[in-house]
Regions:
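Short, conserved active-site loop motifs that form the nucleotide-linked donor/cofactor pocket
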Residues: 8, 79-80, 163
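SAM-dependent methyltransferases
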Residues: 1-11, 15, 193-194, 212-214, ...
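Conserved core of the sugar-phosphate nucleotidyltransferase
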Residues: 116-208, 238
Length: 238
């Protein structure tokens, strides 16, 4: 398929509770530089020339808040649907797939808690998926990796050369992704990311080297790091 014929939608699963962050507010809505963390990813998709629409999957109790305080307040006109998320991330993605327009060719999945994603990352992964069917942003492992037993004693050192840390965005042919989610639901397969499902189906997934700045906010200290990264790009507070 030529790039000009591809209709691409981004799905942002944002229904997690963020238990490791603590507190009553889910981490995707925590303030970062004065704005809800989720806003930063949506800004990138709003301005990206390769994204035609966005679907959010959020906690059911936050549907109104997301519509009024995030989508409407920040002018995110590309957000076409806000759907209730599921218990697991995989459920949230499946719910979002259920409202896709029939015109959609490619689907981009991005973690709501990766606020430092860039337009370049989105374009790279979309172009790779357009060519190969599936692609993800990832980082080569640079630290020494130890396999540790239940008693916290090192069992062995693992060769890090073939190891990469998966990030998002991840992009897939719509038909491949839908097929993988249907089969996973039918067989009770649980995956930690969508690329895992494609691997499980025997589909090739291309890897695009990303950036260490594309952090996933999971702990309070990550908010400080994320704010510093965003500030460094603008020369001021994000």
């Amino acid at each position: 398929m030529g790039r000009e014929r591809l209709h691409t939608v981004a799905i942002v699963p944002a229904a997690g509770l963020g238990l490791r962050m603590g507190g009553a507010v889910p981490k995707q809505f925590r303030p970062l530089g004065g704005l809800p963390l989720l806003v930063y990813s949506l800004r990138v998709f709003q301005s990206s020339p390769v994204i035609d629409a966005v679907i959010l999957a959020v906690p059911e109790a936050e549907l109104r808040y997301c519509q009024t305080d995030i989508v409407d307040a920040h002018g995110f006109t590309k957000v076409a649907h806000i759907v209730p998320g599921g218990r697991e991330r995989q459920d949230s993605v499946r719910h979002a797939l259920g409202v896709l327009d029939e015109r959609v060719d490619l689907v981009v999945i991005h973690d709501a808690v990766r606020p430092c994603v860039t337009e370049a990352m989105v374009s790279q992964v979309v172009d790779a998926a357009a060519a190969d069917g599936a692609a993800i942003i990832a980082l080569p492992m640079r630290d020494t990796v130890k396999q540790v037993g239940g008693d916290r004693v090192i069992e062995r050192t693992i060769d890090r050369k073939p190891l990469w840390l998966a990030q998002t965005p991840q992009a897939f042919r719509r038909d491949w992704l839908e097929e993988a989610h249907r089969k996973a639901q039918a067989e009770g397969m649980a995956a930690t990311d969508d690329a895992y499902l494609l691997e499980w189906m025997g589909r090739p997934v291309r890897v695009i080297e990303g950036s260490g700045e594309n952090i996933k906010v999971t702990r309070p200290e990550d908010l400080v790091i994320g704010e510093a990264i965003l500030a460094s790009r603008t020369g001021r507070r994000p």
